[in-house]
A protein has these predicted regions:
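Short aromatic-glycine-enriched beta-strand elements
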Residues: 26-32
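Beta-strand/loop nucleic-acid-binding surfaces
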Residues: 63-77
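Domain-level recognition of nuclease-like catalytic cores that cleave nucleotide substrates
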Residues: 221-275
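Conserved catalytic cores of phosphodiester-cleaving nucleases, focusing on short active-site segments
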Residues: 19, 160-191, 204
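Nucleic-acid nuclease catalytic cores
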Residues: 185-195, 202-234, 256
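Short nucleic-acid-contacting surface segments enriched for D/E, G, S/T with interspersed K/R
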Residues: 74-87
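A short acidic/basic microdomain associated with nuclease active sites
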Residues: 138-155
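Short, positively charged and aromatic/hydrophobic N-terminal segments
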Residues: 6-8
Length: 275
């Protein structure tokens, strides 16, 4: 695989509050215990509901309980465990049309080597990759200076994350995947079967066959990972089509990230193991 140029990029979050994960009643909402000092009273449930949730959390002296928006619809079962420390972006002073005042954007995972900070914001990978392309800090194989960077562009039966053109008129499509699953220093994707992901890779193969450039970029939303692998145990079909895509000319790359409560920063490329 051809290499990217070295890059340092990042995005920032505003007004972060730390809490403890309790439960996830559905894909979009979590129950989190946070410091009452950082919360607006109108966001809390009734006293009875609060006591019931506090019993569920196992806390004798629990803080306030809030329902928060989860910015990742993946399973994340190995991350979202009761008692885990989570980071919330606070929107209480900029609600707009929001129904929930907080968004869960990150979590701390206990590993054999200590605490691993993981960004869970599924919108963040696209943003940092697009920013890198716009600034010229990422230079893609076979492409010159980019003159068009268009998000959410349709090609065939799929809508890719980014469509690009360079000054010579060369065209290409980029699909970005955020990665939050880690086991013993290896990042895996996906964490759940993804027929949509398989379809996107098939379309990237067609892009190559039609003479355009195609890139699949995995943004591993954590640091201290050694490599990235397709999760064949969870979805063998995704791994098979990914290996086929690499053989047919789709450029496949993965980057680890420096993660803090307030930021996500792409820091270095890591190997993609397709064996």
């Amino acid at each position: 695989m051809s290499a990217f140029f070295s890059i340092i990029l990042g995005m920032k979050y505003e007004k972060i509050i730390v809490g403890k994960f309790i439960d996830r009643p559905n894909r979009f909402v979590a129950e989190v215990e946070i410091d009452a000092a950082g919360a607006e009273p109108h966001m809390w449930e009734t006293e009875h509901q609060r006591k019931m949730i506090n019993r569920k959390s196992g806390s004798e002296k629990a803080g306030q309980i809030a329902f928060v928006h989860v910015k990742n619809t993946g399973r994340c079962r190995e991350l979202l465990v009761p008692g885990a420390t989570v980071w919330l972006e606070d929107f209480t002073d900029r609600m707009g049309t929001r129904k929930l005042a907080y968004s869960l954007i990150g979590i701390e995972k206990q590993t054999e080597n200590g605490i691993l900070k993981i960004n869970m914001d599924s919108q963040a990978p696209n943003k940092v990759v697009r920013e890198a392309l716009e600034s010229g800090k990422i230079k893609l194989e076979g492409m010159g200076k980019l003159t068009v960077i268009q998000p959410e562009k349709t090609c065939g039966n799929s809508r890719f994350d980014l469509y690009i053109e360079d000054e010579e008129g060369r065209k290409g499509y980029i699909e970005v995947k955020g990665v939050t699953l880690e086991e013993r220093g290896t990042a895996y994707f996906p964490d759940a079967p993804t027929e949509r992901g398989v379809k996107h890779i098939r379309e990237l193969i067609e892009v190559c066959r039609n003479g355009m450039g195609a890139w699949l970029i995995f943004v591993v939303q954590m640091r201290n990972v050694l490599k990235m692998k397709p999760n064949d145990v969870t979805h063998r079909a995704f791994g098979d089509i990914l290996r086929r895509a690499a053989e047919e000319g789709v450029h496949v790359h993965a980057f680890s990230c420096k993660v803090t409560e307030e930021s996500l920063e792409i820091c270095e490329e890591i190997p993609v193991d397709l064996t």
